[in-house]
């Protein structure tokens, strides 16, 4: 076995994180082989179904929710972070568009209706094997109607928002981009 093929089999490829790799086809159960596919290199492949099975990661949304008074909604969710505030975030459901997920999560977590939604940027989150799609969700300032998964939420003026978030976190990067107008 070549060094390249061996490293791909072991999941230690090109310095990338070891994402979930398929061993058997989820459609027919056949053991996969490694097949060279264009510029992608060796990819797990089902010869029975004639399909490649790409590395998997979870796609999520994260929203900087703001109102007309230049405030951002910051949440406390103990299961996410005991020490820092966070933004609205959640996993996309099968068949759901990212924009639909963003609107749904703002409604579920804060009980607010999104008036305008703007895509900002994608953020790879290697530690949890996720891709976070960042949005700016604009709402009217109202009382929060929190879901059971949110411990608390508050409206924070733009000027003080970054200091309440963990510096460098995805929430911090997103809020910084939104309040700086990027």
Label the model's feature ranges.
Residues 80-81, 161:
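A short, flexible beta-alpha/helix-coil linker loop
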Residues 145-176:
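NUDIX/MutT-family hydrolases
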Residues 1-80, 91-143, 180-182:
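N-terminal leader/linker segments that precede catalytic domains of diphosphate-processing enzymes
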């Amino acid at each position: 076995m070549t060094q390249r093929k061996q490293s791909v089999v072991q999941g230690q490829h090109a310095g990338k994180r070891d994402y979930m790799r398929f061993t058997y086809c989820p459609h027919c159960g056949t053991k996969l082989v490694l097949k060279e596919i264009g510029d992608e290199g060796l990819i797990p492949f089902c010869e029975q179904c004639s399909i490649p099975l790409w590395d998997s990661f979870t796609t999520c949304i994260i929203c900087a929710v703001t109102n007309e008074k230049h405030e951002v909604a910051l949440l406390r969710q103990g299961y996410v972070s005991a020490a820092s505030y966070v933004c609205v975030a959640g996993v996309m459901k099968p068949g759901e568009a990212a924009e639909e997920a963003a609107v749904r999560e703002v409604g579920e977590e804060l009980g607010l209706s999104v008036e305008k939604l703007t895509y900002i940027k994608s953020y790879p989150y290697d530690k949890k094997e996720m891709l976070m799609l960042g949005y700016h969700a604009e709402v009217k300032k109202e009382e929060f109607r929190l879901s059971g998964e949110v411990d608390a939420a508050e409206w924070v003026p733009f000027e003080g928002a970054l200091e309440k978030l963990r510096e460098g976190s995805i929430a911090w990067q997103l809020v910084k981009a939104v309040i700086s107008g990027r």
